[in-house]
């Protein structure tokens, strides 16, 4: 069943798996996680946004993106693994505190793709252009400062959003819609996180994948049924923006 859900994710956007993330950018920080990475500490008030923190025991490092509360900090993807109860030190502020809960990468690792992104400043939203790996590589000055206008999604195991230009302040907010991984099928008593309109495709797909081992002689007809049901469900799940046609006249 999980193999089938992975197949659905690879086929494109499933609207019920799209979530929106808002993250305040930090001055000069060009690489942010494609999700939220939060560390819980005894006290975050003395730390500075955009500074690097270092774990006293683990030697792990990360940059501070924002401080949502007095005991939490949102981080970039850590280099290394922070551990609970260790002391962390701010590279600029010199502040120290104790880690209460080590950061988890699960939320970011569940990101499959970015559907769209904007940068918000003073209530005004500007669309961010998505570029590919080669286009990002060819940018001559990746640290040029300004309001970000482009991003590249580096789809590693822990995906990273690479911004250009480098944020010139720590007040702009990047808001993006992301496609996330569907919940794995686990205990039978738990409900599947799939809309009811996909139930026929789910049943047909399960029959097809089961037939590969149990009834290979039925595999082709079950595959055709599965594809038909899935395409019908995906067609109904797509966005339907209004379409306007303007007629022109030539004399």
Sequence positions of predicted segments:
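Glycine-enriched, solvent-exposed interface loops adjoining structured elements
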Residues: 1-35, 98-251
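Autoprocessing Asn-cyclization modules and mimics
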Residues: 12-103
């Amino acid at each position: 069943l999980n193999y089938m859900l992975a197949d659905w994710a690879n086929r494109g956007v499933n609207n019920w798996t799209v979530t929106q993330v808002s993250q305040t950018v930090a001055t000069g920080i060009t690489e942010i996680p494609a999700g939220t990475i939060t560390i819980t500490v005894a006290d975050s008030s003395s730390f500075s946004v955009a500074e690097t923190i270092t774990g006293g025991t683990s030697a792990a490092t990360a940059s501070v993106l924002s401080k949502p509360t007095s005991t939490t900090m949102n981080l970039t993807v850590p280099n290394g693994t922070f551990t609970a109860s260790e002391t962390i030190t701010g590279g600029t502020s010199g502040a120290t505190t104790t880690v209460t809960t080590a950061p988890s990468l699960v939320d970011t690792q569940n990101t499959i793709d970015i559907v769209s992104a904007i940068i918000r400043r003073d209530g005004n939203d500007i669309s961010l252009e998505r570029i590919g790996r080669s286009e990002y590589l060819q940018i001559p000055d990746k640290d040029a400062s300004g309001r970000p206008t482009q991003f590249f999604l580096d789809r590693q195991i822990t995906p990273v959003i690479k911004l250009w230009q480098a944020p010139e302040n720590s007040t702009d907010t990047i808001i993006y819609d992301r496609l996330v991984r569907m919940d794995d099928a686990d205990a039978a008593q738990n409900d599947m996180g799939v809309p009811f309109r996909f139930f026929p495709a789910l049943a047909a797909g399960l029959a097809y994948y089961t037939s590969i081992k149990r009834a290979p002689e039925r595999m082709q007809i079950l595959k055709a049924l599965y594809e038909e049901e899935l395409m019908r469900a995906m067609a109904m799940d797509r966005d339907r923006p209004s379409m306007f046609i303007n007629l022109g006249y030539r004399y």
